[in-house]
């Protein structure tokens, strides 16, 4: 196997974050690392940093989820949706993804990994707003916060939450979304940093409550 496609070894922190679910997480990482590039799910630079940049980055969000139904918008390869479903078997997940080949991958992995808490929907978020009612919604690397608000809020129950993974500019995105925040009645909007002191690349989340 060419060196640039070798899959990163799991970091020690993975075991503490996944607990008894570690074998399932390890199998998912193996599947994604060995087949993801070929299937067009991840780029050629990603296998060597699969754990640190993607899987750990995603699972750090798990403690923010509450028992109930969580939707993941634009799940893609399963980041963070499948990772969170592995870590939180007590939570039900709806993975919303419009691309057929990605949906096929997600459905295959749900069956392969034995995840009975996951439903996969081939759709865009705006197409299922009248069909589902979520307690929380997640998304990673989908769009700016201001654009995600009108896509995600209609999916969430009153009192539910947006839990959106963001980069280093999360605070600026919140500032830029002030009009959308007011229009869609979001409250308690905050940026949460996860993994500080534990990992090299922290995870930033914008969390907001739907009033």
UniProtKB/Swiss-Prot annotation:
The protein's predominant localisation is: cytoplasm
UniProt-listed InterPro entries: rRNA_ssu_MeTfrase_G, SAM-dependent_MTases_sf
**Record has Membrane as a keyword:** no
Alphabetical UniProt keywords: Cytoplasm, Methyltransferase, rRNA processing, S-adenosyl-L-methionine, Transferase
Instruction: Give compartment(s).
Output: Cytoplasm
Gene encoding the protein: rsmG
Q: Which family does it belong to?
A: Belongs to the methyltransferase superfamily. RNA methyltransferase RsmG family.
Positions that bind S-adenosyl-L-methionine: 74, 79, 125-126, 140
**Identification of the protein by name:** Ribosomal RNA small subunit methyltransferase G
Q: Which is an annotated GO molecular function term of this record?
A: rRNA (guanine-N7-)-methyltransferase activity
Report the CDD domains cross-referenced here.
AdoMet_MTases
Supply the HAMAP family for this chain: 16SrRNA_methyltr_G (MF_00074)
rRNA processing: present as a keyword of the record?
yes
Superkingdom in the source lineage: Bacteria
**Function per UniProt:** Specifically methylates the N7 position of guanine in position 518 of 16S rRNA.
Q: What is its EC number?
A: 2.1.1.-
User: Cellular component GO terms, alphabetically?
Assistant: cytosol
